[in-house]
Amino acid sequence: MHLSPQEKDKLLIVTAALLAERRLNRGLKLNHPEAVAWLSFLVLEGARDGKSVAELMQEGTTWLRQDQVMEGVPELVHEVQMEAVFPDGTKLVTLHDPIR
């Protein structure tokens, strides 16, 4: 299997996001890397599902609440930027203050 560096990065995000999802399902709070991976994964999947950049930017502020992350994490995550593949090409999606 030959993967580009970008594809390897996305695989790492997916792996970390699946771990984050399991921890959320067990009621555990996410740390900084887990929270960023989870948000990034949801952007990638939303783009794959056909959502627009605007939809993802709006929905992205509802995916994680402050009570789902460890203390201090919301203050560390001011924005999450992710390049995602849309039907009309690759676009940058930015989530501003996504943990509310």
Swiss-Prot record:
The protein's predominant localisation is: cytoplasm
Write the record's keywords in alphabetical order, separated by commas.
Cytoplasm, Hydrolase
| GO molecular function per UniProt | nickel cation binding; urease activity
Entry-linked SUPFAM superfamilies: Urease, gamma-subunit
Name the reaction it catalyses.
Answer: urea + 2 H2O + H(+) = hydrogencarbonate + 2 NH4(+)
* GO biological process per UniProt: urea catabolic process
| Biological or metabolic pathway of the protein | Nitrogen metabolism; urea degradation; CO(2) and NH(3) from urea (urease route): step 1/1
Task: Please indicate which superkingdom the organism of origin belongs to.
Answer: Bacteria
Q: Enumerate the subcellular locations listed in this protein's record, separating them with semicolons.
A: Cytoplasm
List the EC numbers from the record: 3.5.1.5
Keyword DNA damage appears in the UniProt entry: no
Q: Which GO terms describe its cellular component?
A: cytoplasm
InterPro entries annotated for this entry?
Urease_gamma, Urease_gamma/gamma-beta_su, Urease_gamma_sf, Urease_subunit
Relate the assembly described in the record: Heterotrimer of UreA (gamma), UreB (beta) and UreC (alpha) subunits. Three heterotrimers associate to form the active enzyme.
Give the similarity note: Belongs to the urease gamma subunit family.
Database matches in NCBIfam families: PRK13241.1, urease_gam
This one is known as: Urease subunit gamma
